[in-house]
Curated annotation (Swiss-Prot):
Biological role: Capsid protein (CA) is the structural component of the virus-like particle (VLP), forming the shell that encapsulates the retrotransposons dimeric RNA genome. The particles are assembled from trimer-clustered units and there are holes in the capsid shells that allow for the diffusion of macromolecules. CA also has nucleocapsid-like chaperone activity, promoting primer tRNA(i)-Met annealing to the multipartite primer-binding site (PBS), dimerization of Ty1 RNA and initiation of reverse transcription. The aspartyl protease (PR) mediates the proteolytic cleavages of the Gag and Gag-Pol polyproteins after assembly of the VLP.
Gene: TY1B-PL
RNA-binding: annotated segments: 299-401
Name the UniProt record assigns to this protein: Transposon Ty1-PL Gag-Pol polyprotein
Classification via PANTHER family: TRANSPOSASE, PUTATIVE-RELATED (PTHR42648), TRANSPOSON TY4-P GAG-POL POLYPROTEIN (PTHR42648:SF11)
Lineage of the organism: Eukaryota, Fungi, Dikarya, Ascomycota, Saccharomycotina
Domain RNase H Ty1/copia-type: from-to ranges: 1610-1752
Binding site for Mg(2+) 1: 671, 736
Length: 1755
């Protein structure tokens, strides 16, 4: 064979661009160019014609003699080793690098020109010579065939090789146009193939068959350069060569890919137009073929619609499918899918009719129609390198197992396929040869081959468990009459004649033998991959070869049709006698009926019943002996298993082994119940229970959801509790297969802790009886307790917890002990237990006034888990508290009398039980008690409150027998409190805040006025009620004003129309005197003129009027009322919905009636909509929470689990900081180094742009005379301190331009080389925002400028040296700086002084005092930020005049002149601004965030949902120590710095609503726990979801005579570590938010009032500075205002009493604040808490509140 001859050649030699080729050529793979046969033949004919004169005379050539070329020797004479071939384009084996060529493919000067190599230049003549290869032995570029297994050379091949040198290779034509490149590259590839370089040509998968050598690469490069001039190359080729001018392989690969794509499209269109289908192949295969073609065409831009596709498909239908062409042609909207449904239906009908005829032998048509796959339950595991390509599909396997009816005679197989590589051989038919492959038909005369069979080959089958062959010629060691049962895919027996060995002789000269079965009744000869795998042979369908496990290639695999084949030439023939095999053996068992057949015949009855029936002759025609019962015992009928499947029998007492094998608390059962619907958000919807197998001790935990992290927290809690309290380790936990238990997170947790999860089997609930029965028992108890007590359904878990406590204390009838006794705990002290729902009176230790009653009605729920108190529900406050200060409400008419238990009361029995406990309570009541533990850790449903938008009913009025006791009990002792009608509310508002399930903050001890409209800090609902006006020392009077008020707790004592005056005590903040303020009517209030301010001891009076003003000073020019309205009118405050009037019923008389006999259908149905009128809370610390953030994050969940753990303290502060020190936040590095931008940049276009920017920067440096170019200094002569390292940095701006900057390494600059006192000033962000706001209100033009290389205009005073830029190549030299290079410590200050001097002296500007980089004159305002200038002016010509002056000195570019009257877009210092003069301004960063956030590697939108708020209330950061290695710690700290750095940049630019979260998380940069990172991810996720939000400004009303500057202040008392408070301020100019600040108070405050005073005092200095700036930039009068929601703070500011302050720090701040308010003409007003937009700066808010406070100014 030719391939075998080529494989003998010596190692690769190297030759010229024109090489000889053998007479016959075996190609290694399919032509990647898919050149048509006609074109190939034309090319070959042309080549033959051109070389026709050279066939007889070896020295003849088609090219004239060239003086550079020596005449070659005749081809018959082998050249010497160093042969006389000095030609520049020829090389022998020992001449790898001739002159004119360089190593590794880099060409040197080539001594010949392209025309000398072109046969078109000289006409061929007998005297002309053309470079050629030497004889075959030394063929320079011959490639050995990797599949040539023989190492010997026969004479014929040698002769052929000798004659092959007589032919010469015709070079490709010259490329003359870029458009001709596709055709030219085809001829060039053909040229390489003729030059024996076919192995280096990339195949269809882009990889060559073998590795190219360096000399071959040189040959490739030179020939390409010669025949393809660079001026005629396409652009994409030039781009490749610009990266690597020797990468010809990449050009060839892309060319092949392009041509393959074009060829594939044409083939697909032709195939689709010529579809044919008659049912001979499976319908699913036909559908797959068609849909794949349509999909490929659609993906390539050739759209095939349904109508056209259906027409093409129906046109090719024939046979039984033809009628579809007539039934479907009228359907206009028919789809391809619908058409294939009909085709599948017909195909399945055909197969059903054929399969219903059992026959061992089928005709030839059956071979094509059977589509059932071969299934063999006993087949071993299939071993294949690429199982996707194995022949195990339905269609393939079915045809492989069809039974043939032909009589195949034994024959000899001499098939052979010549193949020089391991690439796949694709054969479309028996005669189709691609790339020169030859297929010699087998001489075996097989008759009636299948149409899709490849003769002379074995079909590779991964589904066959045995190898089957029709011819006995290759069977060795055959034995006839084997007792082997073989069935096909339809479970039909295949008669086997003999069994023997099949012996292979592979091309690596190894022999292998496998077992084979002989039968003539098959369609194909099958070679089982399973049996090959048993002898360490696998089929690799990636390379299409049979190989061993060590990678040794044994034989090629041929793909023909849909199957893969291997040639029979590797089989060794045998001399077996055929007649001895063809004698089919018939055993005794074949004459009997098989039992499976009888089993199915008799309706799948069992074997015992069938045998009994045959014995008793109830079934006739055959006897019991006629059935083969050998397989009846172990036979399993699949249909019986499916149809008669039942659950396994649960074995009683099966858990006894666990009780005996495990110690207490080692084996737990757990289950989850829920959800319970129609409950408020604060109430849990699920609970999870645990039961110990040995002790039967039970735990229950509430759950709000079933998320992975929630369940994980419970498991962590229970395991820690058992370990610490019982010194036991849980070994096994039994649970069901719910997703909350089978998730990966919990599985890893259990695995980490060495716990074995024991799951129940599917649908086997009885195996989980312990947990299921416990849940049922607890739910029964829950329903009973709620029904008995009449408590609302949202307290359902309290009933569960009460039942758990009791059940753990009751003895089991089986064990005679309680669970507590088994656990080693003391019995339950019943004297500490109260009936569930027992009415009690709870002491209120902090009433709103001294005359308020101190008792609050409540209902006992269960003993506290975390203290010695009791959990009590207070319906008036809509919360539960943990307290010991309560008294049991007693009376003859007990709460339980409604159940008619013989009219019995249990008061005396209850007294007797709780006598000792009462004495304890009584003794403690002597002291001032603070046990109303609002700070309790009992957080799962504490602080349950109603929707805050409606007023709340507080039931705390003292009741007399006259107005509370019914007639039947009116004569009772008046000292006893009657409770006949004490009823707990049935339901609460379903909108109860989820955030309020956590304990609220302690009430401030600051005196407050009790009013139904006041908040916890003195809030009001009416916004337009100013409390302070500017104070004047010359005009200070006390106000005697009072207003009509309703007592907060006794709101029902007064009617709405009541007009009498009532004195209300007012407690003081720092004094001891109490004063009374008479209530007056609204009419009198409006007529009052306020002249005097009350003392500090008096709290401010209240009025329902919206025009009540309590001033400190009365302005002389503007009335107080107009000032207040003017300041508040334009503020972006939320609009609150109107509140409906609410009645406040008597706590003991007007509670809504409850029908105790009303029953709930189920716990899941709790929460009917018959709740009474919702009542509202006024406490600022309790906010409404509409929904929770719906993104699942680990640890992002409130830890609300409860167990029997001992009492423990827990700090209740939001987002606590775990570290004190915080490093500076590092910004994200957006620049590239030189090596990143240029050296190793694979993006050619980007690289070119960076190179251009590099040269531009160098030219600018030289132009500016940055360094002294006259002298270079030696490094050894200069003090190292004065040598500054330098570098180039590159970045891409948002406008798409690429920029390079040469900078100094100022970060390592020595301190002696600069003046530390100099400062680099830039414009303050507040100054820029103020200027922008004034520009909008005054219709200013805004012009943006940029000064190129600004720092280089500033001279440098110090003596500094730098290393020259890299392109200069002077690494050992230094140059002296003359200009302020970017990066130096002093450069910024030098530039600031330079530009400042120029603006003042040349431009006539002056700098605003106190505001650096803000310059102004009478017409123009300039804000300077390094080299960026923003100009504001009423007259655009004034801006142009400044620009003209600047251009005289500096290279000034106009970024945006701002002359358009339409919307103009700016990019100013990172802010993306949309400005339409006289209308609006929008500030955002959408484009910047869209670019930067994805680079942070934060997972965005894990569930595809957007966040509605940046955080949720009630979350705590764990303070546990981090267990983390140093490298991981540094990595996470760096990640936190990047994330918080970006968030800070955005927050302080315009997203002031995020400042609280940013400030809090910034404190945790050095504590990067998983929880902290998750919270940071949530913040980044929210920024991503809201990246399109903008700060919206609208132009102020033109009629406004003044500028109004307002600071809104707020504080959250004690919500930071070490009892520090969070304070926040928002600044507004003319109703536009221009800045915000959120920070932790520097001092520890002891009350809410102190925190509010601290917040206000922090806002005043900046307010005054902004006021000065505004007056300098705009000459309008200015009104300054302070808004706060703390009345007590306002009272202190306006008071003149200086006698008492709580401490000197507090007193100092208060006194200073008084002076600042008085001396700076500040107006102080009260703002309602619900409208205080600064609330977002101090605490995390629920979604509804967050949106309400921000949607007016940022959206």
């Amino acid at each position: 064979m030719e391939s075998q001859q080529l494989s003998q050649h010596s190692p690769i030699s190297h030759g010229s661009a024109c090489a000889s080729v053998t007479s016959k050529e075996v190609h290694t793979n399919q032509d990647p160019l898919d050149v048509s046969a006609s074109k190939t033949e034309e090319c070959e004919k042309a080549s033959t014609k051109a070389n026709s004169q050279q066939t007889t005379t070896p020295a003849s050539s088609a090219v004239p003699e060239n003086p550079h070329h020596a005449s070659p020797q005749p081809a018959s004479v082998p050249p010497p080793q160093n042969g006389p071939y000095p030609q520049q384009c020829m090389m022998t084996q020992n001449q790898a690098n001739p002159s004119g060529w360089s190593f590794y493919g880099h060409p040197s000067m080539i001594p010949y020109t392209p025309y000398q190599m072109s046969p078109m230049y000289f006409p061929p003549g007998p005297q002309s010579q053309f470079p050629q290869y030497p004889s075959s032995v030394g063929t320079p570029l011959s490639t050995p065939s990797p599949e040539s297994g023989n190492t010997f050379t026969d004479s014929s091949s040698a002769d052929s090789d000798m004659t092959s040198t007589k032919k010469y290779v015709r070079p490709p034509p010259m490329l003359t146009s870029p458009n001709d490149f596709p055709n030219w590259v085809k001829t060039y590839i053909k040229f390489l193939q003729n030059s024996n370089l076919g192995g280096i040509i990339p195949t269809v998968n882009g990889k060559p068959v073998r590795q190219i050598t360096d000399d071959e690469l040189t040959f490739l490069y030179n020939t390409f350069q010669i025949f393809a001039p660079s001026q005629f190359l396409p652009t994409w080729v030039k781009d490749i060569l610009s990266v690597d001018y020797t990468d010809i392989m990449k050009i060839l690969s892309k060319s092949i890919e392009k041509m393959q794509s074009d060829t594939q499209e044409a083939n697909d269109i032709v195939t689709l137009a010529n579809l044919q289908y008659n049912g001979s192949t499976p319908a699913d295969a036909f559908e797959t073929k068609v849909t794949n073609i349509i999909d490929r065409l659609n993906n390539n831009g050739i759209h095939i619609n349904n109508k056209v596709a259906c027409q093409l498909i129906m046109r090719g239908l024939s046979g039984e499918y033809k009628f579809l062409r007539y039934t479907r042609h009228r359907h206009l909207n028919m789809t391809v899918a619908e058409l294939f449904l009909d085709i599948h239906a017909i195909y399945e009908e055909q197969q059903g009719s054929r399969n219903s005829k059992p026959n061992y032998r089928r005709n030839l048509s059956d071979e094509k129609n059977d589509s059932r796959s071969y299934t063999n339950t006993t087949k071993p595991k299939v071993i294949a390198r690429n199982p996707q390509k194995t022949n195990n599909s339905k269609s393939k396997t079915a045809r492989a197992h069809n039974v043939s009816t032909s009589n195949n005679s034994p024959s000899t197989d001499n098939d052979s396929i010549s193949k020089s590589t391991t690439e796949p051989i694709q054969l479309n038919n028996k005669h189709d040869l691609h790339l020169g492959q030859e297929l010699t038909e087998s001489t075996v005369n097989h008759t009636n081959h299948s149409d899709d069979e490849l003769p002379g080959h074995l079909l590779l089958d991964s589904g066959a468990s045995r190898t089957l062959i029709r011819s006995a010629h290759h069977i060795h060691s055959a034995s006839s009459n084997p007792d082997i049962n073989v069935v096909d895919a339809q479970k039909r027996n295949i008669p086997i004649n003999a069994i023997g060995d099949l012996q292979f002789h592979f091309q690596d000269n190894t022999k292998t033998s496998i077992k084979v079965l002989h039968t003539p009744n098959i369609a194909y000869d099958l070679l089982s991959l399973n049996e090959l795998a048993a002898v360490d042979i696998t089929a690799c369908f990636t390379k299409n070869v049979l190989e061993r496990s060590d990678g040794t290639v044994l034989a090629p695999i041929v793909k023909y049709g849909d199957f893969y084949w291997v040639s029979k030439k590797y089989l060794l023939p045998s001399n077996i006698s055929v007649p001895t095999i063809n004698n089919v053996h018939t055993s005794e068992s074949t004459r009997k009926y098989p039992y499976p057949f009888i089993h199915r015949m008799l309706a799948h009855a069992n074997a015992q019943t069938i045998r009994y029936s045959l014995k008793n002759n109830t079934i006739t025609y055959f006897n019991e002996s006629d059935v083969d019962w050998s397989s009846a015992i172990d036979y399993q009928c699949p249909d019986c298993l499916i149809g008669k499947s039942t659950k396994h029998r649960h074995i009683k007492g099966s858990r006894l082994k666990y009780q005996n094998s495990y110690e207490p608390f080692q084996y737990l059962h757990t289950d989850i119940f829920g959800p319970v619907h129609n409950l408020p958000n604060s109430a849990p919807s699920y609970f999870i229970s645990f039961t110990d197998e040995t002790t039967k001790f039970r735990w229950v935990y509430p759950l709000h959801d079933r998320r992975e992290d929630s369940i994980l927290d419970v498991f962590t809690t229970i395991l820690a509790f058992i370990k610490n309290q019982f010194q036991a380790s849980v070994l096994v936990i039994q649970m069901d297969r719910g997703s909350e238990y089978t998730n990966r997170t919990l599985h890893k947790f259990l695995e980490k802790n060495g716990i074995t999860p024991c799951y129940t089997t599917t649908a086997d609930s009885r195996a989980h009886g312990v947990a299921e029965r416990l849940n049922r028992t607890l739910l029964d108890d829950c329903r009973t307790q709620l029904q008995c007590s009449g408590l609302p359904n949202h307290l359902w878990f309290s009933a569960i917890e009460f039942s758990t406590i009791v059940r753990n204390s009751l003895a089991s009838p089986k064990s005679k002990k309680s669970a507590r006794q088994h656990a080693g705990l003391a019995g339950l002290d019943i004297s500490t237990l109260l009936p569930f729902g027992q009415p009690v009176i709870v002491n209120d230790h902090n009433p709103n006034s001294k005359i308020h009653p101190r008792g609050i009605p409540g209902y006992a729920l269960h003993p506290s888990r975390n203290s010695y108190g009791y959990i009590i529900y207070l319906p008036s406050l809509k919360k539960t508290v943990d307290t010991t200060n309560y008294v049991i409400l007693q009376g003859k008419e007990s709460r339980l009398d409604q159940f008619n238990y013989d009219a019995l009361t249990f008061d005396e029995d209850l007294n007797r039980l709780t006598a000792s406990y009462h004495s304890f309570i009584a003794s403690n009541e002597i002291q001032e008690s603070n046990d109303l533990n609002i700070e309790s850790d009992h957080d799962f449903q504490s602080d349950i409150e109603l929707h805050p938008e409606q007023p709340r009913n507080v039931l705390s009025k003292a009741v007399s027998p006259t107005d509370s006791t019914p007639p039947s009990t009116h004569t009772e002792d008046s000292k006893r409190v009657s409770k006949t009608n004490i009823r707990a509310p049935r339901e609460v508002d379903p909108n109860i805040s989820e955030s309020n399930i956590l304990p609220s903050k302690k009430r401030s001890s600051t005196p407050q006025i009790s009013n139904i409209e006041s908040t916890g800090s003195g809030g009001m609902h009416k916004l337009n009620v100013p409390l302070l006006a500017p104070m004047s020392q010359s005009n200070t009077h006390e106000s005697s004003h009072a207003s009509k008020s309703k007592d907060f707790r006794h709101s029902d004592s007064y009617s709405e129309n009541e007009t009498n005056h009532t004195n209300v005590p007012i407690s003081s903040t720092g004094g001891t005197n109490n004063k009374t303020v008479p209530q007056i009517s609204d009419q009198e209030t409006e007529k009052r003129i306020i002249h005097r301010s009350p003392s500090i001891d008096a709290s401010p009076p209240e009025n329902n009027s919206s025009h009540n003003i309590v001033p400190i000073k009365t302005p002389t020019t503007v009335s107080e009322q107009n000032t207040e309205e003017s300041i508040i009118a334009d503020l972006p405050l939320p609009d609150l919905p109107p509140e409906s009037p609410t009645e406040f019923p008597d706590p003991f008389k007007e509670l809504p009636p409850i029908n105790s006999r009303q029953t709930n259908s189920s716990l899941g149905g709790i929460g009917d909509s018959n709740a009474y009128t919702t009542i509202n809370s006024k406490k600022r610390s309790l906010e409404d929470n509409e929904t929770e953030i719906k993104v699942s994050r680990d640890t992002w969940n409130t830890k609300n689990m409860r167990s029997l753990e001992p009492p423990r303290s827990k700090k209740r502060i939001h987002l606590i900081a775990a570290v004190k020190a915080v490093k500076s936040i590092k910004p994200i590095r957006t620049t590239l180094r030189y090596d990143e931008a240029i050296t190793y940049n694979k993006d050619i276009k980007e690289k070119e742009k960076y190179i251009e920017a590099y040269h531009k920067e160098v030219n600018q440096l030289l132009k500016m005379k940055t360094w002294d170019t006259d002298e270079y200094y030696d490094r050894k002569e200069i003090d190292p301190k004065r040598v500054i390292n330098s570098m180039f940095i590159f970045n891409k701006k948002r406008d798409g331009t690429h920029k390079a900057r040469f900078v100094a390494r100022g970060d390592i600059q020595h301190p002696d080389t600069y003046d530390s006192g100099m400062q680099s000033n830039t414009v303050h962000h507040y100054a820029l925002m103020t200027s922008l706001s004034l520009a909008l209100d005054n219709n200013y033009y805004i012009t943006q400028l940029d000064i190129s290389s600004a720092y280089l205009y500033a001279d440098i005073k110090e003596e500094l040296y730098i290393r020259p830029p890299p392109h200069l190549g002077m690494n050992d030299k230094l140059i002296r700086l003359k200009k302020s290079l970017y990066g130096l410590k002093q450069s910024g200050a030098n530039w600031y002084e330079t530009i400042k001097s120029y603006l003042i002296k040349q431009c006539g500007m002056e700098e605003v005092r106190g505001w650096s980089c803000v310059f102004k004159n009478s017409q123009v305002t300039i804000c300077l930020f390094v080299d960026d200038m923003i100009l504001f002016s009423k007259d655009l010509n004034a801006n142009k005049k400044i620009i003209t002056t600047l251009k005289k000195q500096y290279d000034t570019k106009i970024i945006n002149l701002g002359e358009s009257d339409n919307e103009i877009q700016y990019d100013i210092l990172g802010l993306e601004i949309k400005y339409q003069r006289g209308k609006y301004m929008k500030l955002g960063m959408e484009n910047s965030l869209t670019e930067k956030i994805p680079k942070l590697n934060v997972p965005l939108n894990p569930k595809g949902r957007k966040l509605s708020a940046p955080g949720q209330p009630g979350l705590y950061i764990d303070q546990d120590e981090l267990e983390i290695d140093e490298d991981e710690y540094k990595e996470k700290v760096h990640e936190m710095q990047k994330l918080i750095g970006l968030a800070s940049y955005v927050g302080y630019k315009f997203r002031f609503d995020l400042l609280y979260y940013i400030n809090t998380l910034a404190q945790h940069i050095l504590f990067p726990s998983r929880q902290v990172l998750d919270m940071t991810y949530e913040l980044i996720q929210f920024m991503w979801d809201t990246r399109d939000k903008q700060l919206i400004w609208h132009k102020n009303k033109p009629t406004e005579p003044d500028n109004k500057l307002v600071a809104i202040s707020d504080a959250s008392y004690g919500n930071q570590p070490y009892y520090k408070s969070q304070i926040g301020n928002i600044y507004l100019l003319n109703g536009k938010v221009i800045g915000g600040k959120s920070t932790k108070a520097s001092l520890t405050c002891t009350s809410t009032t102190e925190a509010e005073i601290h917040a206000i005092s922090e806002s005043v200095p900046l307010l005054n500075n902004l006021s000065y700036l505004i007056q300098e930039l705009n000459k309008k009068p200015i009104i300054k205002g302070l808004l706060t929601d703390s009345r007590s703070t306002i009272s202190i500011i306006k008071s003149t009493n200086e006698e008492k302050f709580r401490n000197r720090f507090f007193g100092t701040k208060a006194m200073r604040l008084r002076d600042e308010v008085s001396g700076n003409n500040l107006y102080v007003y009260y703002i309602e808490t619900k409208k205080n937009i600064a609330d977002v700066m101090t605490k995390p808010l629920p979604i509804k509140t967050f949106k309400l406070l921000t949607n007016k100014w940022i959206h």
